[in-house]
């Protein structure tokens, strides 16, 4: 394929984004409660009811008034032959004769016609579920034309032939209805079984920009693609579909949930210990070291001992006692003569005391400066070690990136472990560390952090419900407490979904769209309503009005047809 032709063909499906959209429908990413509305939407029950209504209306309209009146005269003659001693002109005889004929006519239709229609409806001859998936995901529907299912058609025809044999000795109305049923059902089966909507994994779709046409490929053959909602094609393809509009929120919720699970795993990993030496232990180690390596008369030991004891005492009286004890030990005098005899100290003693105090202050200041210098050096060492490790990590990542193709990171669609590669390779959960001297643990990471993904799930549920309700105009059915029981199609839903499937996909132009009053009714209730408003019911009621003048109020015909 030359470059000019390649530029004129744009791949639409499968692409990374289109496959993600179908996987979302299958519940792979962030399946929430609101997405269950899609299951209600793809239920083929509404189209099955529409097919049932079309077939039943068609067969009931096939009979003529002459057929009905002929059957009535035949039935009336048989009744008179069996009941020769009855008064044929009495109202009771006429009424019972007419009602028995009308009711047996209805029961025969239910037995021979409805049962065969039910078998056709439940034979899974449509691809309505996959059609709904394509509309939800891409707004494009590939349609495969194939040969009709002759095996299924012959099976249904054999059942209808058996029903026709049962009605062979009956009236002209039943023979006409069964003949019309066989013709209508055969036509429906040939149309519906010659259409197949493939799964998203079975087909490819391309857009020919030159012809402005979508073309599908199924098993190496070109197929037609019906455009329900046309996508926007620019630099990238943006599908005009509900799942495309929800995609960013769905993936964000999914990644947050995945991130929360990683946080649980990382924050609860086995940790040996974070050890730090206490202050008291440091002082005791210093004193023990001095006692082992120095004599008791060593002035360094005495000064350090004084500093340690002063640091351990927090009260004024305690500090005073420590100072007095130190002066007593240094002067080796147990009794303070000045306090005992009240004599004033001499000038020499005062000078010695002043010099001693200054020496103590100088030594204390020098020791504190040494400790501060040591702490600063240790902090600088840790800082530079951290920077070196960071630089090494960055160099390692750059080296790895050079070996791979460069592509911009996308947190929404990239793998979570790759997005959290730095956190994944962290050694915090695999090594033990010591707290440096003079440092404090600001965050121990022992408390578990989990992102608020539950709130995102609730928001996504509401977003799913809002999108589907407003896009397809569904209506909820609630109980007296206001709890939603289920959702059902409205007339707008029928127009938006059933209409394109009926006229664009299956090409059933002779079929009327279902009225929304039938979408949640049972088949028996629908059959009763259609029969009561059919041409056959009108003919039967007309015969009753003429044969039984007392029934002109319509009560008899309504009771019969509504039974």
Curated annotation (Swiss-Prot):
Keywords: Host nucleus, Viral genome packaging, Viral release from host cell, Virion
The keyword Ribonucleoprotein belongs to this UniProt entry's keyword annotation: no
GO BP field: chromosome organization
One Pfam entry name: Herpes_UL6
UniProt entry tagged with the keyword DNA damage: no
UniProt-annotated location(s): Virion; Host nucleus
Top-level taxon of origin: Viruses
Signal peptide: none
Cellular component, GO, one term: host cell nucleus
Subunit description: Homododecamerizes. Interacts with terminase subunits TRM1 and TRM3.
Protein family per UniProt: Belongs to the herpesviridae portal protein family.
Function field: Forms a portal in the viral capsid through which viral DNA is translocated during DNA packaging. Assembles as a dodecamer at a single fivefold axe of the T=16 icosahedric capsid. Binds to the molecular motor that translocates the viral DNA, termed terminase.
Name of the protein in question: Portal protein
Organism: Saimiriine herpesvirus 2 (strain 11)
């Amino acid at each position: 394929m030359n470059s000019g032709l390649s530029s004129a063909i744009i791949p639409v499906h499968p692409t990374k984004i289109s496959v993600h959209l179908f996987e979302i429908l299958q519940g792979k990413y962030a399946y929430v409660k609101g997405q269950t509305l899609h299951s209600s939407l793809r239920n083929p029950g509404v189209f099955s009811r529409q097919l049932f209504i079309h077939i039943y209306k068609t067969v009931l309209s096939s009979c003529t008034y002459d057929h009905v009146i002929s059957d009535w005269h035949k039935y009336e003659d048989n009744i008179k032959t069996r009941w020769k001693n009855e008064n044929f002109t009495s109202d009771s005889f006429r009424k019972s004769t007419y009602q028995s004929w009308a009711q047996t006519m209805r029961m025969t239709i239910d037995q021979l016609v409805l049962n065969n229609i039910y078998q056709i409806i439940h034979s899974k001859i449509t691809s309505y579920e996959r059609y709904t998936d394509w509309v939800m995901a891409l707004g494009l529907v590939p349609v495969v034309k194939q040969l009709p299912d002759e095996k299924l058609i012959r099976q249904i025809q054999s059942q209808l032939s058996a029903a026709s044999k049962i009605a062979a000795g009956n009236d002209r109305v039943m023979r006409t209805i069964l003949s019309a049923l066989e013709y209508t059902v055969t036509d429906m089966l040939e149309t519906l079984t010659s259409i197949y909507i493939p799964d998203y994994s079975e087909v490819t779709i391309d857009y020919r920009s030159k012809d402005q046409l979508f073309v599908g490929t199924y098993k190496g053959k070109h197929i037609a693609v019906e455009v329900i909602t046309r996508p926007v094609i620019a630099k990238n393809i943006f599908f005009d579909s509900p799942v495309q509009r929800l995609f960013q929120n769905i993936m964000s919720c999914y990644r947050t949930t995945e991130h929360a699970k990683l946080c649980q795993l990382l924050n609860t990993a086995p940790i040996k210990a974070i050890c730090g030496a206490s202050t008291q232990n440091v002082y005791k180690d210093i004193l023990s070291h001095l006692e082992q390596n120095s004599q008791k008369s060593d002035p360094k030991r005495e000064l350090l001992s004084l500093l340690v004891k002063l640091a351990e005492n927090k009260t004024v009286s305690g500090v005073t006692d420590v100072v007095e004890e130190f002066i007593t030990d240094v002067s080796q005098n147990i009794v303070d003569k000045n306090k005992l005899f009240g004599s004033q100290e001499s000038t020499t003693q005062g000078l010695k005391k002043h010099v001693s105090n200054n020496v103590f202050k100088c030594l204390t200041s020098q020791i504190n400066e040494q400790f501060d210098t040591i702490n600063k050096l240790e902090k600088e060492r840790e800082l530079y070690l951290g920077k070196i490790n960071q630089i090494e990590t960055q160099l390692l990542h750059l080296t790895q990136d050079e070996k791979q193709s460069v592509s911009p990171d996308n947190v929404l669609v990239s793998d979570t472990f790759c997005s959290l590669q730095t956190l994944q390779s962290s050694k915090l959960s695999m090594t033990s560390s010591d707290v440096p001297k003079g440092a404090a643990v600001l965050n121990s990471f022992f408390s578990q952090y989990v992102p608020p993904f539950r709130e995102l799930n609730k928001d996504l549920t509401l977003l799913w419900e809002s999108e589907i309700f407003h896009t397809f105009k569904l209506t909820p059915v609630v109980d007296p407490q206001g709890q939603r029981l289920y959702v059902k199609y409205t007339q707008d839903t029928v127009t938006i979904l059933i209409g394109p499937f009926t006229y664009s996909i299956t090409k059933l132009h002779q079929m009327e769209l279902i009225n929304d009053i039938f979408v949640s009714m049972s088949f028996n209730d629908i059959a009763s309503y259609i029969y009561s408003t059919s041409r056959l019911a009108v003919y039967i009621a007309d015969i009753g009005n003429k044969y039984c003048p007392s029934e002109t109020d319509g009560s008899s015909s309504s009771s019969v047809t509504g039974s």
